[in-house]
C-alpha cells in the first residue's frame, strides 16, 4: 500500500469561502458588521432559536452565557471530569466554584445520578458536553434539575424566571446535531458553539451563544447584554456609530472584548451553505469506519440512532485491554504510516491546573478508564475514499497486534 499523509482535522475551505473573504476585505468593513449580523441570523434559523450572538471563541461564548446568567463568586457549577478545559475554565473565570462529576461506566457522558446528588443550594448551572457531536441525555438532565428545584436559590431575574439549576450546553463539537427532533441550540437553556479551525464548521477562530426563549425575559434585551459584554460595555458597536451624527456612546460596564469580525463571518456564511453536505460526508465516513472496526471488538461511539443524529465531529475508538503505553505505541505506529491520530480527552483532574485546585483522578475512575485506551482517528471532509480505506487498513493491521 502506497504511503499517504493523512492530517487529523484540516479545515475544509473552498473558493466559495475565499471569495467571500475577499469581498469582505474589499468592502472596507472588516470588523463586526453586516456579515456578522447575517451569520447570526442564519445560525439562529438553522438552530431554531430566536437569537444567536457570534463571538471570537466558544470559550468566550460559554463565559458570557454564565455572566449573562449572573453566575459568579459563591456559586457552584457542575462540570464533567471528562471534557476539554474550556468547559470548566469559563466558570472559573466568572469566579464560580467548579465541581467535577465522573462519567458513566464505558461512556463519555456524565453520571447523571452523581450529577443529581451533587446539586446543592449553591449550584447554579450544570455544563453538559455533547462530546464528539453526540447530544447528551437531556431528558435525564432536565429530570435531575427539576427534582432538585426546591434547593435552587435565584440571585437575579433571569435565574428566577428559569427557577432551577440552569442547563448550559457546551456544544463546541455539536453544531447540526439533533436529539428527538430538536437541534443543538434549542435543547439546553443556553448553548455555546465552537467555530475553531478543527471543527466541522469553521470561521478560523470563533464561536457563538444561543438560548431557548425564557418566559418573562426579552430576547432582544438578552442579545443587547451579550453585545455589551463582548465589546467593552460600549453602548454602540462600530456599525451603529456609522449612522449620521451617531458618534457618541456610553460605557455601561468595564467588560470584555470578544466580538467576531466580518472576515471570520464571511467564512462562516459560506460554510453554513455547505454544511448539510459536510455533515452527510462525515456520516458516510463514520459508517465505513464502523463497518471495518466494530467486528474486531474495537469500541466506538454511537453517532446515529433513533434518539439522536450526531454532527459526527470525532471518531473515538477504544482498544480493549491495552495500557496507556500500548496506546502510545499504536499512535506512533499510525504516525509512521503517515496517519495523525489524537486522544479526546485527558480528564481534567489529571491536568496540572486542576490538580493544583485539589482534584485527583482517583476520584473519577470511569473517566480515567474511558481515557486510558482511547484513540481518535482522523475524521474530516478532506478525506477521500482512498484515504478512509488507508486509515482503516493500517489501523486494523496495527491494532491486531494488541487485541
Regions found by a protein language model. Give the residues of each.
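Phosphate-binding glycine-rich loop
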Residues: 29-76, 90-92, 100-101, 149-155, ...
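Conserved PLP-anchoring active-site segment centered on the Schiff-base-forming lysine
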Residues: 65-127
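Hydrophobic "lid"/C-terminal helical patch
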Residues: 21, 25, 65, 391, ...
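PLP-dependent aminotransferase class I/II
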Residues: 37-41, 49-50, 125-129, 134, ...
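Active-site phosphate-binding strand-loop segment of PLP-dependent enzymes
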Residues: 106-203, 209, 213-215
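Hydrophobic/aromatic ligand-binding patch that stacks against planar heteroaromatic rings
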Residues: 89-91, 183, 263
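Residue-level detector of anion-binding/catalytic polar loops
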Residues: 97, 166, 340
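N-terminal "arm"/small-domain region of PLP-dependent enzymes with the aminotransferase-like
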Residues: 1-29, 34, 250-252, 378
Amino acid at each position: 500500500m502506497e504511503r499517504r499523509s493523512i492530517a487529523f482535522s484540516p479545515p475544509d475551505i473552498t473558493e466559495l469561502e475565499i471569495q467571500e473573504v475577499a469581498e469582505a476585505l474589499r468592502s472596507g468593513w472588516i470588523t463586526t458588521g453586516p456579515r456578522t449580523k447575517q451569520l447570526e441570523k442564519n445560525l439562529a434559523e438553522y438552530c431554531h432559536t430566536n437569537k444567536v450572538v457570534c463571538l471570537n471563541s466558544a470559550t468566550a461564548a460559554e463565559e458570557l452565557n454564565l455572566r449573562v446568567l449572573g453566575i459568579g463568586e459563591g456559586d457552584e457549577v457542575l462540570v464533567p471530569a471528562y471534557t476539554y478545559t474550556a468547559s470548566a475554565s469559563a466558570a472559573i473565570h466568572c469566579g464560580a466554584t467548579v465541581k467535577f462529576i465522573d462519567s458513566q461506566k464505558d461512556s463519555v457522558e456524565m453520571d447523571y445520578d452523581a450529577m443529581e446528588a451533587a446539586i446543592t443550594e449553591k449550584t447554579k448551572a450544570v455544563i453538559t458536553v455533547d462530546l464528539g457531536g453526540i447530544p447528551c441525555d437531556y431528558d435525564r438532565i432536565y429530570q435531575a434539575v427539576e427534582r432538585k428545584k426546591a434547593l435552587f436559590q435565584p440571585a437575579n431575574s433571569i435565574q428566577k424566571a428559569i427557577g432551577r439549576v440552569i442547563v448550559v450546553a457546551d456544544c463546541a463539537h455539536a453544531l447540526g446535531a439533533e436529539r428527538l427532533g430538536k437541534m443543538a441550540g434549542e435543547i439546553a437553556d443556553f448553548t455555546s458553539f465552537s467555530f475553531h479551525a478543527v471543527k466541522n464548521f469553521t470561521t478560523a477562530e470563533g464561536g457563538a451563544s444561543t438560548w431557548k426563549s425564557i418566559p418573562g425575559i426579552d430576547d432582544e434585551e438578552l442579545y443587547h447584554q451579550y453585545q455589551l459584554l463582548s465589546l467593552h460595555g460600549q453602548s454602540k458597536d462600530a456599525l451603529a456609530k456609522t449612522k449620521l451624527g451617531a458618534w457618541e456612546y456610553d460605557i455601561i460596564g468595564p467588560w470584555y472584548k470578544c466580538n467576531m469580525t466580518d472576515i471570520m463571518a464571511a467564512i462562516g456564511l459560506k460554510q453554513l451553505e455547505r454544511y448539510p453536505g459536510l455533515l452527510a460526508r462525515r456520516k458516510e465516513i463514520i459508517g465505513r469506519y464502523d463497518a471495518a472496526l466494530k467486528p474486531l471488538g474495537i469500541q466506538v461511539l454511537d453517532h446515529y440512532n433513533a434518539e439522536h443524529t450526531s454532527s459526527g465531529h470525532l471518531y473515538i475508538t477504544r482498544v480493549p485491554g491495552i495500557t496507556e503505553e500500548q496506546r502510545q505505541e499504536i499512535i506512533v505506529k499510525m504516525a509512521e504510516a503517515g496517519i495523525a491520530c489524537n486522544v479526546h480527552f485527558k480528564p481534567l483532574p489529571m491536568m496540572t491546573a486542576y490538580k493544583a485546585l485539589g482534584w485527583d483522578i482517583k476520584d473519577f475512575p470511569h473517566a480515567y478508564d474511558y481515557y486510558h485506551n482511547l484513540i481518535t482517528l482522523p475524521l474530516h471532509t478532506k478525506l477521500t475514499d482512498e484515504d478512509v480505506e488507508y486509515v482503516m487498513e493500517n489501523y486494523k493491521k496495527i491494532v491486531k497486534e494488541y487485541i
